[in-house]
Amino acid sequence: MQFQVLVIGGGPGGYVAAIRAAQLGLKVGLIEKENLGGVCLNWGCIPSKALLKAAEYYQQIKHSDEFGITCEKVSFDFNRIVQRSRDIASQMNNGIGFLMKKNNIQTFEGTARLISATEVSIQGKTETTTTKVTSDNIIVSTGARPTILPHLEVDYDRVPSALNSPIFSIPSEPKSNSLNSWIAFFRSKTKK
């Protein structure tokens, strides 16, 4: 298979580059080993903003008496909050898939390995299939992975780790009973 532009990585840098190249009339392929949208859309920026918004609403309701509004027994449903963040990520992931099809970008699911300046092998998820493709131009946009800084100790009983299991799909509420303190993991400080 021959492309004019082959993009390795389907995160914000990769899929935008692929779409733009296709809009310019080039034959484009894109290789992504996990989910279109990368870490940002699936496990970072987008789902964390959904969780932060839930924490913001929760805090506003808890302190609504300052505005003359009384709300008694304010509570939250942790599983629904997390599910909403997953649903938003899934919807956006599907939107990127639609844009790939709309712009005639051939997508490959698997791990890319550069063989030469113009040739790439793609190891499928099943690890039994390998596809070789060539391209006049190759864009490497492989993104990021979460990591724990060596000098930073993390209390895994209180803060779930994105390294062990994705934090946005943990099966139950963390031991901290406060949604806002749990969300604090994503920002340097919480609003009061």
Predicted regions and their residues:
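Hydrophobic alpha-helical segments that mediate membrane insertion or helix-helix packing
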Residues: V7, A18-A21, K175, R187
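Low-acidity, Ser/Thr- and Arg-rich intrinsically disordered low-complexity segments
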Residues: S169-S172, S176-W182, R187-S188
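Glycine-rich flavin
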Residues: Q2-F3, I19-L26, I31-P171
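Beta1/beta-strand and adjacent pyrophosphate-binding region of the FAD-binding site
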Residues: M1-G11
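N-terminal Rossmann-fold NAD(P) dinucleotide-binding loop
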Residues: G14
